């Protein structure tokens, strides 16, 4: 999912500040570790579209988008609540631009303790 090491609360808060400064709306999504990656077992192929195209890759939204969010501490509080409710799930923060009606960015804020997908840069190989 990410080549970055886990983000600290301070780093997440700075990202939220940037999101809010651009008038975007933060939102949390989560997925069980066996459903987080797109694959044949958890996706629906949509007819004769491109052979590798898979649909139904959506994660579950945690509550509603945070329309009234004013600072990073509010998002951190929701991350903690989501982690407490779903400790073995991946959790990502995404943000939406209401003017363009698109998702602007997304990144992991919680990797489950059972996850084995992250490797330190020294341990990676191509």
Curated annotation (Swiss-Prot):
Transmembrane segments: none annotated. The keyword rRNA-binding does not apply. The keyword Ubl conjugation does not apply. GO terms for cellular component: chloroplast. It is found in: Plastid, Chloroplast. GO terms for biological process: photorespiration; reductive pentose-phosphate cycle. InterPro entries: RuBisCO_ssu, RuBisCO_ssu_dom, RuBisCO_ssu_sf. Keywords: Calvin cycle, Carbon dioxide fixation, Chloroplast, Photorespiration, Photosynthesis, Plastid. Gene3D superfamilies: Ribulose bisphosphate carboxylase, small subunit. Heterohexadecamer of 8 large and 8 small subunits. HAMAP family: RuBisCO_S_bact (MF_00859). Belongs to the RuBisCO small chain family. RuBisCO catalyzes two reactions: the carboxylation of D-ribulose 1,5-bisphosphate, the primary event in carbon dioxide fixation, as well as the oxidative fragmentation of the pentose substrate. Both reactions occur simultaneously and in competition at the same active site. Although the small subunit is not catalytic it is essential for maximal activity. The basic functional RuBisCO is composed of a large chain homodimer in a 'head-to-tail' conformation. In form I RuBisCO this homodimer is arranged in a barrel-like tetramer with the small subunits forming a tetrameric 'cap' on each end of the 'barrel'. This is Ribulose bisphosphate carboxylase small subunit, chloroplastic 1.
